[in-house]
């Protein structure tokens, strides 16, 4: 399994972004030559509409961008919500797959900020795995044909949130409901059949949470770090057996995905009184008193995931306060108000950190022990989905559109036939631009 994990990282080349937060699951991209700045009239290769409503983040592989979305029917006999998988050509933005995976006649109530299509899909070879929380999980071919479907039973108060991950031949999902005993658990499905291979029930008390797990390597063992309400736990990803757990008070409705660096796992504890704890992952049993290295109580995020770059940990909270701390000690090195509100997670690419806000504004900084802002970039639309990076481009989903952002002016000249307000939806001009920056893609 160690070999499989290493190969997955090595083989995930710069033209792939296969899951939420990229090949490592921690928001790091290997691409260079990425744009520093953009706007509606600058460095937009293409912009294409996305039907429906959804906050799943883009994933990219083999020249395609995959998303999920939900569309509502309010007329006629077929009322309810259609949960769909979409694919777009990376070179042109043209929609090439639009498949209904599930139809829900009476969908659950949502938090006003959430959607019925918030978990990010996984693309792995000739399979796409999509997850719509308690509404259903499925595997598709790259042509959009459904291979299998299953439904995971739990009661989610505000809709779905956490994304699935792939570990060998397992698809692993956090299912944190608030329906009482046994309604919060972690489950591993067989990727070929969708059948349950193992299930680990959360310890009591349990409540709703919306997180994505992370597999890390600690010594001679793999650990599946899964954050839930009131506690996080590490499991053996092969069989679901608990390795260690850490508890925290007033922690539920967790959203951020944990990250790992400098020998520590960084965990956001959730709603009400958010904090971020750094845990040494080499323990067993209850490590609450023995393995918490430090706690950040000021500026911890409710929704965006943290990111580790070198010796520093960077976070932005939901109200726009960015914080840099020493990852080993927890010492705050700077805090800065970026402005706006934040749900999307930051990424590190080409030596820079990108923080996209809900207002469509992305603040770019240079990582370091002093705050240094490099650019502020605006698009017309709300951003709650996290960015994808592939083919020396950013793929950004707003509430209504999908963008490909590239440094199309590299070398000092603008791409022929593209400029100013002439950005259009996918079409002939997109193919011309795409061919100039990606020869052979068409």
Outline where the language-model segments fall.
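Sec-dependent signal peptide recognition
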Residues: 1-8
């Amino acid at each position: 399994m160690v070999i499989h994990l290493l190969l997955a990282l090595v083989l995930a080349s710069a033209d792939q972004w296969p899951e939420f937060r990229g090949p490592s699951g921690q928001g790091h991209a290997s691409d260079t030559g990425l744009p520093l700045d953009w706007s509606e009239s600058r460095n937009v290769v293409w912009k294409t509409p996305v039907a429906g409503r959804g906050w799943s983040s883009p994933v990219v592989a083999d020249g395609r961008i995959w998303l999920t979305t939900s569309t509502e029917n309010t007329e006629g006999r077929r009322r309810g919500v259609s949960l769909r998988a979409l694919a777009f050509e990376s070179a042109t933005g043209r929609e090439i797959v639009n498949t209904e995976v599930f139809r829900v006649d009476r969908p659950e109530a949502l938090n006003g900020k959430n959607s019925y299509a918030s978990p990010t899909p996984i693309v792995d070879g000739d399979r796409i795995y999509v997850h719509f929380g308690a509404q259903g999980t499925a595997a598709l071919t790259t042509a959009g044909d459904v291979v299998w479907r299953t439904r995971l039973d739990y009661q989610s108060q505000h809709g779905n949130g956490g994304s699935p991950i792939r570990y060998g031949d397992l698809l692993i999902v956090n299912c944190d409901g608030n329906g009482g005993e046994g309604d919060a658990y972690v489950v591993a499905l067989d990727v070929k059949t969708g059948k349950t291979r193992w299930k680990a029930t959360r310890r009591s008390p349990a409540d709703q949470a919306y997180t994505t797990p992370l597999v890390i390597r600690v010594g001679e063992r793999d650990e599946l770090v899964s954050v839930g309400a009131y506690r996080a736990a590490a499991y053996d990803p092969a069989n679901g057996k608990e390795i260690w757990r850490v508890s925290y008070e007033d922690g539920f409705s967790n959203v951020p995905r944990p990250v790992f660096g400098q020998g520590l796992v960084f965990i956001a504890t959730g709603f009400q009184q958010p904090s971020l704890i750094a845990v040494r992952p080499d323990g067993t049993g209850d490590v609450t008193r023995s393995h918490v290295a430090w706690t950040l109580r000021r500026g911890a995020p409710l929704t965006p995931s943290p990111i580790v770059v070198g010796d520093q940990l960077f976070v932005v909270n939901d109200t726009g306060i960015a914080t840099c701390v020493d990852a080993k000690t927890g010492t705050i090195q700077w805090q800065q108000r970026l402005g706006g509100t934040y749900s999307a997670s930051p990424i590190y690419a080409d030596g820079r950190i990108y923080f996209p806000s809900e207002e469509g504004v992305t603040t770019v900084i240079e990582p370091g022990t002093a705050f240094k802002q490099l650019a502020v970039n605006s698009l017309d639309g709300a951003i709650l989905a996290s960015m994808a990076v592939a083919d020396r481009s950013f793929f950004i989903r707003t509430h209504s559109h999908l963008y490909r952002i590239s440094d199309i002016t590299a070398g000092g000249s603008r791409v022929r036939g593209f400029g100013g307000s002439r950005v259009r939806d996918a079409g002939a001009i997109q193919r011309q631009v795409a061919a100039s920056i990606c020869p052979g893609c068409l």
